[in-house]
Curated annotation (Swiss-Prot):
Catalyzes the conversion of N5-carboxyaminoimidazole ribonucleotide (N5-CAIR) to 4-carboxy-5-aminoimidazole ribonucleotide (CAIR). This is N5-carboxyaminoimidazole ribonucleotide mutase. Gene3D superfamilies: 3.40.50.1970. Pathway: Purine metabolism; IMP biosynthesis via de novo pathway; 5-amino-1-(5-phospho-D-ribosyl)imidazole-4-carboxylate from 5-amino-1-(5-phospho-D-ribosyl)imidazole (N5-CAIR route): step 2/2. Keywords: Isomerase, Purine biosynthesis. Disulfide bonds: none annotated. InterPro entries: PurE_ClassI, PurE_dom, PurE_prokaryotes. It catalyses: 5-carboxyamino-1-(5-phospho-D-ribosyl)imidazole + H(+) = 5-amino-1-(5-phospho-D-ribosyl)imidazole-4-carboxylate. Pfam families: AIRC. The keyword tRNA processing does not apply. Its EC number is 5.4.99.18. It comes from the Bacteria.
Length: 161
């Protein structure tokens, strides 16, 4: 496994699945797991502290509400942690975003956008990180970016179908 995708609860999976979908597109192996910072703190500590020795290179952590999962995962590992704020009902994910982005100096979490765009971009960013040491992954990322460009160039007029 190259990427660990963790989330605070099973209800976060519909959002976090977009990270997995992007990794699938780039041929990057991953594992998924529910690891709650509040309900299973020891599981979180064990998961994050053992990730490197298990071959994980990047952790994508999605959480809503108080959203302590990404920061706590980062506290237990030296691996890059990408935080995805999962949209919440009460504050539409702003609470999650602020919880993830406001990390103390010395414990870094790369924070993505709220919700589905953030999860998809976390998958892309993880592939880009891995691609710095794996040309086959980087080639797939570059092909994806070129495809996006071609799609826009092929349909420049929004009034046309």
């Amino acid at each position: 496994m190259k990427v660990g995708i963790i989330m605070g609860s099973k209800s976060d999976w519909p959002t976090m699945k977009l990270a997995a979908d992007m990794l699938d597109q780039f041929g990057v192996s991953y594992e998924t797991k529910v690891v709650s910072a509040h309900r299973t703190p020891q599981l979180l500590a064990d998961y994050a502290s053992s990730a490197k020795e298990r071959g994980i290179k990047v952790i994508i952590a999605g959480a809503g509400g108080a959203a302590h999962l990404p920061g706590m995962a980062a506290a237990f590992t030296s691996l890059p942690v990408l935080g995805v704020p999962v949209q919440s009902r009460a504050l539409k994910g702003m609470d999650s975003l602020l919880s993830i982005v406001q990390m103390p100096k010395g414990i870094a979490v790369g924070t993505l956008a709220i919700g589905e765009a953030g999860a998809a971009n976390a998958g892309i960013l993880a592939a880009q990180i891995l691609g710095t040491h794996d040309e086959s992954i980087m080639a797939k990322v570059e092909a994806f970016r070129n495809e996006q460009t071609e799609t826009v160039l092929a349909n420049p007029n929004p009034a046309e179908d």
